[in-house]
């Protein structure tokens, strides 16, 4: 696993732990092989949820549209400079 993917997965794990301690604890009960993809998926969903629930002074529709486009591009190109999207595209391309 390359360094950028490791850092991206660590970012997803950090985001998950920061936003949901109970979810993070639940993941630990699962087989360790599935931890990274679960953190990657949760991190992705958390970003989308953050757009909807938090950025009230922003154009949420535009942010969601950009996030959608960035997500599809990351999956197609198998890379993103956004570490959360990079780990998500990895999970999609590896397990999807």
Predicted regions and their residues:
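Acidic catalytic motifs of isoprenoid enzymes
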Residues: 1-96
């Amino acid at each position: 696993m390359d360094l950028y993917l490791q850092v991206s997965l660590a970012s997803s794990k950090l985001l998950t732990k920061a936003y949901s301690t109970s979810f993070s604890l639940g993941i630990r009960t699962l087989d360790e092989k599935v931890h990274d993809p679960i953190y990657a998926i949760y991190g992705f969903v958390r970003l989308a949820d953050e757009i909807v629930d938090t950025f009230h002074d922003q154009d949420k529709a535009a942010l969601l549209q950009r996030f959608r486009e960035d997500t599809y591009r990351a999956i197609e190109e198998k890379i993103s400079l956004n570490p959360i999207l990079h780990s998500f595209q990895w999970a999609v391309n590896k397990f999807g």
